[in-house]
């Protein structure tokens, strides 16, 4: 397959470019359907005139339906996208990129989607879709899925669909509130993901950023203890990775802690822990829920983070062995490997 692709790149470069463009159009329609032509044109940076011709071709091939409320994929369109995905990974060089990134960061596996979510917001949705597919491959008969907060994990929740195998799915927040907006908190995302998956959920009703005394007291509350035991029995953890300073500011972190994070050169954050460039913990938010030591016992851990601006944060987090599947985008992967 690789030899054929290399030959096509030399003999028929235009063919692969057309194929890539049409694949991206189908991919974007799948993520946002129903969508109007003007919105699609603006999102993909393709002129309406060119897009009109491409959409007409896809309609003639029975891959796209055009209705008054916008464009949607046909059943054939969905099937073709599914068949093409592995081929397009080879065409775009993502298969090799995944292998290189997996070895570079010592990952359980690497899944890379095309594009850069810093430049194209729809790429975050595609990461969400890839993360959902990854989760479903790893579900067993009975599952407890712990999820963190953040905009990227919210994208995973938004792309979640019911499990066709009707497996038992219980979703729980990995941690209590960490100071984010309500819509980005683990509780909110946990409930959203469970509803989209037709699963069930348990919530953790505790305030974020507790003092040591309050933390010690609240974890002894029977209702909190029960949910904590469920969280610590998780069979899967889905979490994001953020830039340390960005996350600290977003959470209205106290000035004293901000100084500590800055003085200790924190570059990355995950579920309330701040790490330096060597992957060492330099600050921890006192919040109820899953702790760093707990993740070693979790069979499946999926980290979802992308955008070229997060390359340094992703690399720092994986400086320590994590036994994790990373779902990221081309922008982050290429910058990370280019900077090595």
Curated annotation (Swiss-Prot):
One of its GO terms (molecular function) is cis-regulatory region sequence-specific DNA binding. Residues 37-56 bind DNA. Stability and function are regulated by the effector molecule fructose-1,6-bisphosphate (FBP). In the presence of glucose, binding of FBP to the low-affinity sugar-binding site of CggR disrupts dimer/dimer bridging interactions and triggers a tetramer to dimer transition, which leaves two physically independent dimers on the target DNA and allows transcription of the downstream coding sequences by the RNA polymerase. In addition, FBP and several other phosphorylated compounds can bind to a high-affinity binding-site and protect CggR against aggregation and proteolysis. It comes from the Bacteria. SUPFAM superfamilies: NagB/RpiA/CoA transferase-like, Winged helix' DNA-binding domain. GO terms for biological process: regulation of DNA-templated transcription initiation. Keywords: DNA-binding, Repressor, Transcription, Transcription regulation. Beta-D-fructose 1,6-bisphosphate binds at residues 149-152, 175, 185, 250-251, 269, 310. It holds the Pfam family CggR_N. Disulfide bonds: none annotated. Contains an N-terminal DNA-binding domain and a large C-terminal effector-binding domain. Contains two distinct sugar-binding sites with different affinities. Belongs to the SorC transcriptional regulatory family. In the absence of glucose, represses the transcription of the gapA operon, which encodes five key glycolytic enzymes. Binds specifically to the cggR-gapA promoter region and blocks the progression of the RNA polymerase, leading to the arrest of the transcription. Homotetramer. Binds primarily as a dimer to each half-site of the full-length operator, with much higher affinity for the right site. Then, both dimers interact, bridging the two-half sites of the operator region. This is Central glycolytic genes regulator. It comes from Bacillus subtilis (strain 168).
């Amino acid at each position: 397959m690789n030899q054929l692709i290399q030959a096509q790149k030399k003999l028929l470069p235009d063919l692969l470019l057309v194929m890539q463009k049409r694949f991206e159009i189908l991919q974007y329609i799948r993520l946002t359907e129903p969508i109007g032509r003007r919105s699609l044109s603006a999102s993909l940076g393709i002129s309406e005139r060119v897009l009109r011709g491409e959409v007409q071709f896809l309609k003639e091939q029975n891959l796209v339906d055009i209705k008054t409320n916008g464009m949607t994929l046909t059943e054939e369109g969905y099937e073709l996208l599914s068949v093409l995905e592995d081929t397009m990974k080879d065409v775009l060089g993502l298969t090799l990129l995944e292998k290189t990134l997996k070895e570079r960061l010592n990952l359980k596996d690497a899944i890379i989607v095309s594009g850069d979510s810093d430049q194209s917001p729809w790429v975050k949705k595609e990461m969400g879709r890839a993360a959902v597919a990854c989760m479903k491959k790893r579900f067993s008969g009975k599952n407890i899925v712990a999820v963190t907060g953040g905009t990227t994990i919210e994208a995973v929740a938004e792309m979640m669909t019911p499990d066709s195998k009707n497996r038992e799915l219980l979703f729980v927040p990995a941690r209590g509130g960490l100071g984010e907006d309500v819509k980005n908190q683990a509780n909110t995302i946990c409930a959203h993901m469970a509803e989209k998956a037709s699963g069930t959920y348990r919530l953790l009703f505790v305030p974020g950023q507790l003092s040591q005394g309050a933390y010690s007291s609240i974890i002894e509350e029977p209702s909190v203890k029960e949910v904590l035991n469920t969280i610590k029995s998780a069979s899967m953890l889905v979490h994001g990775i953020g830039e340390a300073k960005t996350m600290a500011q977003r959470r209205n972190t106290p000035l004293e802690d901000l100084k500590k994070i800055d003085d200790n050169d924190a570059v990355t954050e995950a579920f309330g822990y701040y790490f330096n460039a060597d992957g060492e913990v330099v600050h921890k938010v006192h919040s109820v829920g899953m702790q760093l030591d707990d993740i070693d016992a979790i069979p499946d851990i999926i980290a979802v983070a992308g955008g070229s601006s997060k390359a340094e944060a992703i690399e720092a987090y994986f400086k320590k062995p994590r036994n994790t599947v990373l779902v990221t985008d081309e922008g982050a992967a290429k910058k990370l490997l280019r900077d090595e």
